[in-house]
């Protein structure tokens, strides 16, 4: 398709999202991450293996995604997301996928997706659990992430994989559900709000 999807975070959620969207023939993917691949990532980040250790996630992800589908255009953003750089890139994409692991980033992604009226799929995982929210901000009456979480009551330790741990299959399931929500929207199928 000609759809453009921006994936923020090439970790346990972003990897399966990118892989399944690429396999599905998405026209354009943007991937944002500033991190390098570490051994502790391998069990939940399906695009990476031991040969990729210490390399930049976005560069390796682009290479592997191009091997899956060379027709998908992939643009990489190898930096930590902030308000300034996110405002510059969000306008070019139809769909925003939040695969981050901290609420500061999640709220920033939420706020700018709302401001620019984007379709946002946000996901989170911890231990054996995960969830996704699908927000179509083109609809002015749509709630946002802040409606469900009060910023002052949240600790980033809730989403910290190093602190809490994560079962790798949970990341794959939640990331696949995020990809599924994007595909359903592109195909004009009914949306699930979980």
Predicted ranges, named:
Residues 1-192:
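Adenine nucleotide-associated cytosolic modules
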């Amino acid at each position: 398709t000609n759809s453009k999807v921006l994936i923020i975070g090439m970790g346990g959620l972003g990897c399966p999202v990118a892989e399944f969207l690429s396999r599905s023939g998405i026209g354009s993917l943007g991937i944002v991450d500033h991190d390098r691949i570490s051994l502790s990532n391998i069990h939940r980040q399906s695009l990476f293996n031991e040969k990729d250790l210490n390399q930049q996630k976005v560069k390796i992800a682009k290479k592997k995604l191009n091997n899956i589908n060379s027709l998908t255009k992939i643009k990489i953003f190898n930096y930590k997301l902030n308000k300034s750089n996110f405002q510059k890139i969000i306008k070019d994409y139809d769909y925003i996928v939040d695969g981050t692991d901290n609420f500061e980033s999640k709220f920033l992604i939420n706020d700018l997706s709302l401001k620019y009226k984007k379709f946002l799929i946000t996901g989170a995982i911890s231990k054996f659990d995960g969830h996704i929210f699908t927000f179509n901000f083109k609809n002015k009456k749509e709630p946002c992430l802040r409606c469900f979480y009060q910023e002052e009551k949240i600790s980033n330790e809730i989403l910290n994989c190093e602190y809490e741990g994560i079962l790798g299959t949970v990341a794959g399931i939640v990331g696949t559900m995020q990809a599924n929500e994007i595909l359903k929207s592109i195909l004009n199928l009914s949306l699930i709000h979980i």
